[in-house]
């Protein structure tokens, strides 16, 4: 175990687990214990661990060139951007190293759009309570959660939160200074909460009516996680700008900001930049991820396995009502809203060597790699059931 006085910032409440290697949906500790990884690095390891195509891609690129900066053309960027724009609403792509950076780019793109159109007063962005958009000063302001804002000085100006799904509050918040609306198609850290499709369609209508840009944060929902390449495809709504990260790198730090040509029109030479973003290693991995995710039949298999898993969780909810209150989510972005404290259920799952991720609203996220098989999904269900059964037995003993 780690030393008590490790020379690290004390910013993480880490579980006492040390993983030495991974294979597919499994992680192995230094002592050889095997865990079913339905945390996937918080929806990052889209193709599981040590996927041979990703390993080969990064090995091959590592023997060529790692980094040159954006002072020069990077062929891998052009290839990956072309594939992303051909498969989405977007015309333009800016590569980053993380989701927070992708959101920063999205925010700057929206503000710069209005500035370049002669409306510098339009800089405010409306967001929704319970959202999570990153940990930079701007993105914690966008998220609006006090626990992340506390102690870092005045909140960055220009972000207005409204209650999740509140149409009247949203309409009232739009002013002559509003530049954009920013929303997650499904809130991840907020507790796997999905707004109604009609609400997202209303956002699109309001943006069109008031000359606002619609920004989707698909950092967690994107790249096959919901069973579609991007979650917006399931809503009937296309954004103007979209932030992407996590699954697109399959575990390698990679993010992107996608936009229509019009929305990106203000992002001219010199107004934004990155040193590492779009580096050749990241581009090799991103292209390798898309080789797999965009292959014929892959997303259909994701949807099939997701159905097995979702139906199984629904059955467990019925059988363990004192432990499981509700099943939420889409595809392989699923949440268990617990009746017991979610930390207790997460700990019980970990005792069964199953990994999940805590979220808000007393929810545990289950985020299996997209390569999970139906058999592995059933193994996960068996472990959730064992955890629920142990908590039920514990409750009975107390009673």
UniProtKB/Swiss-Prot annotation:
One of its GO terms (molecular function) is N2-acetyl-L-ornithine:2-oxoglutarate 5-aminotransferase activity. Pfam families: Aminotran_3. InterPro entries: AcOrn/SuccOrn_fam (IPR004636), Aminotrans_3 (IPR005814), Aminotrans_3_PPA_site (IPR049704), Class-III_PLP-dep_AT (IPR050103), PyrdxlP-dep_Trfase (IPR015424), PyrdxlP-dep_Trfase_major (IPR015421), PyrdxlP-dep_Trfase_small (IPR015422). It is found in: Cytoplasm. The modification N6-(pyridoxal phosphate)lysine is found at residue 246. Homodimer. PANTHER family: AMINOTRANSFERASE CLASS III (PTHR11986), SUCCINYLORNITHINE TRANSAMINASE (PTHR11986:SF113). This is Acetylornithine aminotransferase. It comes from Agrobacterium fabrum (strain C58 / ATCC 33970). The lineage of its organism: Bacteria, Pseudomonadati, Pseudomonadota, Alphaproteobacteria, Hyphomicrobiales.
